[in-house]
Regions:
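Generic, ordered loop/turn and secondary-structure boundary motif
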Residues: 23, 68-70, 91-96
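Residues embedded in well-ordered secondary-structure elements
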Residues: 23, 35, 63, 74, ...
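Extracellular loop and loop/strand-boundary signature of outer-membrane beta-barrel proteins
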Residues: 15-21, 57-61, 69, 110-115
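Residues that define the transmembrane beta-barrel architecture of outer-membrane proteins
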Residues: 26-30, 66-70, 77-79, 119-123
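Gram-negative outer-membrane beta-barrel transporters
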Residues: 1-58, 128-130
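Acidic side chains
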Residues: 47, 57-59, 71, 84, ...
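C-terminal beta-signal and adjacent terminal beta-strands/loops
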Residues: 53-54, 76-131
Length: 131
């Protein structure tokens, strides 16, 4: 678990950021995980991590929403060989990692928030052989 407290002082910019948290500095973040050893060298891993909302940038006041991601791995391992079937973002959580605020659409070029979304659910296999 992490706690972070940031505070901008003496900042001169287009908007007033005095006494505001810095960009990409969530106040709370956490990660918890566990491994379960099954029979015959099989195992299961689960980890959950998340963060509270944060400001996208020091050039505007838009913020992300808090989010939590779950990852799962089912694997097999022996002395020389490891194989994992993994799923990242198990519940296919829709979340934003970056935010940009500017005018990009003619004719009025009104400032609009554009978000970069985090990765969707990913499923993969990792195989390792030690020789």
């Amino acid at each position: 678990m992490g706690f972070l407290k940031t505070n901008i002082k003496n900042w001169e910019s287009r908007i007033d950021l005095e006494d505001r948290a810095q960009a990409h500095a969530p106040e709370h973040s956490y990660s918890i995980g566990g491994n379960l050893n099954l029979k015959n060298n099989f195992y299961l891993k689960l980890d959950i991590n998340g963060k509270s909302s944060f400001y996208y940038s020091d050039s505007h006041d838009n913020q992300s929403k808090s989010y939590q991601l779950t990852n799962l791995t089912f694997g097999y391992s022996n002395a020389n060989f490891t194989a994992d079937l993994w799923i990242r973002n198990l519940f296919d959580k829709y979340y934003s990692t970056r935010g940009f605020f500017f005018g990009n659409e003619a004719p009025n070029f009104i400032d609009t928030l554009y978000r970069r979304q985090g990765d969707p659910k990913n499923i993969g296999i990792s195989i390792r052989y030690n020789f």
